[in-house]
Amino acid sequence: MELAGRVALVTGGARRMGRAFVEALAGRGMRVAVHYGASADDANAVVATLRDAGHDAATFGADLRDATQAIGLPARIVAHFGRLDVLVNSAAVMERVPVAETTVQQWDDILHLNLRAPFFLAQQAAPHLAAVHGKIVNIADLGGLEPWRNYPAHSVSKAGVVMLTKVLAVALAPDITVNAIAPGTVLVPEDYDDAKRTFLSETTPLLRLGTPNDAVEALLYLLEHGDFVTGETLVVDGGRLLRR
């Protein structure tokens, strides 16, 4: 897919990995819808920077834990930009809540944002994407491919994203491709100290941490070159999953 001039919606695009995706897609000439949940200031700053550089970008706030807001978001993008070519479902929450401590509200919040929202966003975006042979990229992580004992709701939600990717790939073919990226240690939690970072590096076969650019390159591959790839989850973890 030639990206220049096309429109991408990146959920959770105001911070961290989502921001890296936004900046990369804008750099490819895409017009970018930057979704945010609670990070309005960050989203506005990202868009201001992009506009100063000559890119076309706009912010769209929505609490994706609310099904009504998730369902309505794609139509807002189309109303603003006139089309939608790419959906990147990167908004997520990763909360450390062991099994015995997980409340119904925590479970629902995590599953609604991480899994339910990507489904309904894809559902509502599908007619627009199909018209232009568009693409969906979901962001999973290693927690969806192995059990994280202290993150039960998160692990379940991301495992669901992996299967959702397969289901949507079949359901939306041949007009839309649907794939996922499962990043490993490409952007570690902000509160990790040097000891934790060193441990992660030493327990990764490639003996280093990744960078956001590693995940960005995976996204660009799927969008620009992966026209015959659908239903797959591309693991970007330096081989870390192999040591489990």
Protein language model annotation of sequence segments:
Residues 122, 157, 165:
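Active-site helix of classical SDR
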Residues 173-177, 230-231:
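Short, small/polar-rich loop/turn modules that mediate ligand/substrate recognition or access, typified
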Residues 127, 169-174:
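Alpha-helical segment proximal to the catalytic Tyr-Lys
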Residues 2-33:
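Canonical Rossmann dinucleotide-binding motif of NAD(H)/NADP(H)-dependent dehydrogenases/reductases
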Residues 145-146, 220, 224-244:
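Short C-terminal tail/terminal secondary-structure segment
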Residues 98-99, 106-111, 200:
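Substrate-binding pocket helix/loop in short-chain dehydrogenase/reductase
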Residues 141:
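Residue(s) in the substrate-gating loop at a strand-loop-helix junction
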